[in-house]
UniProtKB/Swiss-Prot annotation:
Pfam families: DUF167. It comes from the Bacteria. SMART domains: DUF167. One of its GO terms (cellular component) is cytoplasm. This is UPF0235 protein Atu2660. SUPFAM superfamilies: YggU-like. It comes from Agrobacterium fabrum (strain C58 / ATCC 33970) (Agrobacterium tumefaciens (strain C58)). Belongs to the UPF0235 family.
Length: 112
């Protein structure tokens, strides 16, 4: 169930912590291309970023491709993005080491 969420709902995609942000992502591996496909809300009302990568879900290749994609789109080093949960699932929680107050500006780069 895909939705174009208003800006005030985008904050539901991430949680701010003292020195990082936790971002909810739904990854489609073997998706033909590396891209951010917008924001999706599941049946439970939880929002997450939709991403696809061309890499296969074997040996962590799709996860590595996701980190490369997000780092490039956000303008952050790859080392600043790590997995908190979901390394073997489509739905993932990522830790992004960046100033939580600046994250909204960075996040808007993903849509561009």
């Amino acid at each position: 169930m895909e939705h174009a969420l208003p800006d005030d709902c985008l904050s539901g995609l991430w949680r701010k912590h003292d020195d990082h942000v936790r971002l909810s992502v739904r990854l489609t591996p073997n998706g033909g291309r590396d891209a951010i496909d917008g924001v999706e809300q599941d049946a439970d009302g939880n929002a997450h970023l939709k991403a696809r990568v061309s890499a296969v879900p074997e040996g962590g290749k799709a996860n590595k491709a996701l980190i490369v994609l997000l780092a490039k789109k956000l303008g952050l080093p790859k080392s600043s993005i790590t997995f908190i949960s979901g390394e073997t699932a489509r739905k993932k929680i990522l830790r992004i080491d960046t100033d939580p107050e600046d994250f909204e500006k960075l996040f808007k780069k993903l849509a561009g």
